[in-house]
From Swiss-Prot:
Glycans are attached at N64, N142, N224. InterPro entries: Glyco_trans_34, Nucleotide-diphossugar_trans. Its EC number is 2.4.1.-. It comes from the Eukaryota. The chain crosses the membrane at residues 12-32. Keywords: Glycoprotein, Glycosyltransferase, Golgi apparatus, Membrane, Signal-anchor, Transferase, Transmembrane, Transmembrane helix. It holds the Pfam family Glyco_transf_34. The lineage of its organism: Eukaryota, Fungi, Dikarya, Ascomycota, Taphrinomycotina. PANTHER family: ALPHA-1,2-GALACTOSYLTRANSFERASE GMH3-RELATED, ALPHA-1,6-MANNOSYLTRANSFERASE MNN11-RELATED. It comes from Schizosaccharomyces pombe (strain 972 / ATCC 24843). This is Probable alpha-1,2-galactosyltransferase gmh2. It is found in: Golgi apparatus membrane. GO terms for biological process: protein N-linked glycosylation; protein N-linked glycosylation via asparagine. The keyword Nucleotide-binding does not apply.
Length: 346
């Protein structure tokens, strides 16, 4: 081939090259402007053929098998402290087993706008008490030294915790500015048992306010969930009036979740998404990628993320598991609200 090309006069070579480039540009324009359904056809091919193969490759998660995560980048490894280790002496009475749940606090010792320093020890104690009562593991990851903002450090901290607890099934990431108010209520009894989760998941509801296309269409949760669908969920989260709220969120410990988290923290993707925080980034990912959206389950806010004020479906009521003081800094009421509800812990 090289010999044949060398025999072609230079002027003809450049002529052929120019014609080829023009033809390529014309073909690209034809596809782009005439076959407007091409993108949808490719997406359909992905959903029907490629995605199932990816699903088969990832497999369904199981607490009976642990997996090895790739090492984190060294600059994203933070100090991790186990404040409570679950007991494995007794037979599991719940599904998932209590000892396979990790309660995780990721913090630099502060909450939004430098609040929370004087309530940090109480936040730790609250989680120790709850984990002890429910036989969960409780892990604290101190992200003070990480070279990224605290809200972006959550995802590598979850990955780090997944690596530390390879046999754990679920990791519950709960922000520092939240109090577990009902320590008698387990996650399993509240919603995490597969049969309970099937009843609790919100259906036919907008999953994110970010449009999925130029027409402004939105992505919705499924109309129903089978138990098989439940097994494939990797993230459980709730919404507030602004959209998805990552102040209280659960991650299934699986290779699919690890990949999800790795993409979630990608700075290049975050720049493309124009995401100001981890919640914006999550909204972008599930609006643009149907396969990632299928991994996310939406549950009522008061199940894991009740607020101190708001409409009935949002505002904390006695017996609720958690209260989250999101936005308390706006009126400088964080310490006041903390002390008020800390006294109501049951």
């Amino acid at each position: 081939m090289a010999l044949m090309l060398s025999r072609i006069p230079r002027r003809f070579f450049f002529l052929f090259l120019t014609v080829g480039l023009i033809a390529g540009a014309f073909l690209y324009s034809l596809i782009y402007f005439v076959d407007v359904d091409l993108v949808s056809k490719v997406n359909q091919l992905y959903d029907q053929q490629i995605a199932p193969m990816l699903s088969d490759a990832i497999g369904t998660p199981s607490v009976n098998h642990s997996f090895e995560l790739a090492p984190l980048d060294s600059h994203l490894v933070a100090t991790s402290t186990t404040f409570h280790e679950a007991s494995y002496e007794s037979e599991p009475q719940q599904n998932p087993a209590s000892q396979n749940i990790v309660l995780l606090l990721v913090s630099d010792g502060h909450t939004s706008y430098n609040n929370g320093a004087n309530t940090f020890e109480e936040a730790i104690q609250n989680r120790v008490d709850y984990s002890t009562k429910q036989n969960y593991n409780f892990e604290y990851v101190n992200v003070t030294g990480l070279p990224i903002p605290a809200v972006w450090s959550k995802m590598p901290a979850v990955l780090q915790t997944m690596k530390k607890y390879p046999k754990a099934e679920w990791i519950w990431l709960l922000d520092q500015d939240a109090i577990i108010t009902n320590t008698h209520l387990s996650l399993q009894d509240s919603f995490l048992k597969p049969e309970n989760l099937q009843k609790t998941l919100i259906t036919n509801t907008i999953l994110t306010k970010r449009p999925i296309n130029a027409n402004g269409d939105l992505r919705y949760t499924p109309s129903n969930y089978s138990l098989k669908d439940i097994e494939n969920l990797m993230v459980i989260i709730s919404q507030d009036h602004n959209g998805l709220n990552a102040g209280s969120i659960l991650f299934r410990n699986s290779p699919a979740t690890a990949l999800f988290l790795d993409i979630w923290t990608d700075p290049v993707v975050a720049e493309c998404a124009k995401a100001n925080n981890e919640q914006d980034m999550l909204g972008y990912l599930i609006s643009k990628h149907s396969q990632l959206a299928s991994l996310v389950g939406l549950i009522p806010q008061r199940k894991i993320n009740a607020f101190h004020e708001g409409p009935e479906n949002m505002e904390w009521q006695k017996g609720d598991l958690v209260i989250h003081f999101a936005g308390c800094w706006v009126e400088n009421r964080c310490d006041e609200l903390w002390q008020k509800f800390y006294a109501l812990i049951d």
